[in-house]
């Protein structure tokens, strides 16, 4: 599984950098122009983001910063490759239930299935009640 951030995780960015990696960074950070130029506004936003996720405010976008940004933008990313359905249990089901804003007991029962089907309907997906990659992504967008 990949996101827009995946190709750039080995790329270290700092003030003065330019290009597509900077645009991806800026879009992920939000609240700043997406112009592909790592200037003062991007630097300030990077430091603010780093501090908000308890990373040192280094002004440098390294692997740790890319990883945290990816999880901030795609909080369900760790589960995209998993399948959850009635009878499933565990951390992925807890994350699913929290994303659906229902009681998070870690057990995929009829209530979770109903909530999943509603999310699938809103996303114009087949209403199977089974959560695989497309449904994970759709639920994430609905968060």
Set out the residue ranges of the language-model regions.
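Cell-envelope/ECM-targeting effectors and their regulatory/trafficking segments
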Residues: 1-143
């Amino acid at each position: 599984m990949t996101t827009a951030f995946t190709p750039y995780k080995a790329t270290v960015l700092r003030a003065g950098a330019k290009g597509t990696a900077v645009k991806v960074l800026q879009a992920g950070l939000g609240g700043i122009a997406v112009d592909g130029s790592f200037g003062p506004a991007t630097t300030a936003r990077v430091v603010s983001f780093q501090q908000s996720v308890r990373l040192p405010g280094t002004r440098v976008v390294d692997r740790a910063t890319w990883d945290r940004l990816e999880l901030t933008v795609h909080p369900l990313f760790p589960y995209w490759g998993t399948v959850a359905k009635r009878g499933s249990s565990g951390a992925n089901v807890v994350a699913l239930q929290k994303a659906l804003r229902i009681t998070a007991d870690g057990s995929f029962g009829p209530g979770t299935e109903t909530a999943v089907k509603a999310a699938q309907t809103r996303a114009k997906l087949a209403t199977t009640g089974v959560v695989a990659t497309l449904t994970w992504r759709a639920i994430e967008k609905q968060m």
